[in-house]
Amino acid sequence: IQPLSLYSTTKVNSENFILNTKNSSFEPCILRFATAHGLSPRMRFDLLLQEFLRDAILDKKIRIYGPNFWRPLAHVDDISNACITTIKSSKNLISGQVYNVGNTSENYTKKMLAEIIQEFVPSTEIEITGSKTDLRTYKVSFDKIKSNLKFISKKTIRNSIQDILSKIEKGNLDPRASEFSNMSKLTERVKAF
């Protein structure tokens, strides 16, 4: 692993610290989640798939920085099920282990994601722009969790796109509401302080 940001460096350092504290009464297991997607009680429209879908619906345009940058994605239901699977697994399969949570077939380039969304929202224009400072690109293997814990993610980005579009079309979800963006909520709290 080669962390590219302070955030990822902190995560790796934390994982190493936790794993190094393993003993007979503490047997940690690290789960590394792919980028979450899908409907959830606390929706996030500041995550890649939902952000692209929101922009397609409201702006009729998806702007892509780094179109060939890869991202792994996982449905929130699969992430939850991976946690349950891990908790129920025998300690010899999880103690001191690190598992990536997702499905290898759910690695996409940003351009691939935009094109799939365009299938659902055909009026969407895709605009490729110069890269921002975020240069992260990574494809992830999820073979270890599949092999060791027999865990397989079941839901795809297409499932999420259909579910989210349905909820928005019914008027039950406003993708621009600040409650669906961590940065917007943080900004509101700072201003209130």
Regions found by a protein language model. Name each.
Residues 1-30, 35-36, 41:
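Catalytic helix-loop patch of NAD(P)-dependent Rossmann-fold dehydrogenases
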Residues 8-11, 46, 107, 135-136:
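Short alpha-helix boundary/capping motifs
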Residues 21, 52, 56, 117-121:
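Short amphipathic helix/loop within the catalytic HATPase_c
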Residues 26-31, 38-63, 73-74:
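Oxidoreductase cofactor-interface core, primarily capturing Rossmann-like NAD(P)-dependent enzymes
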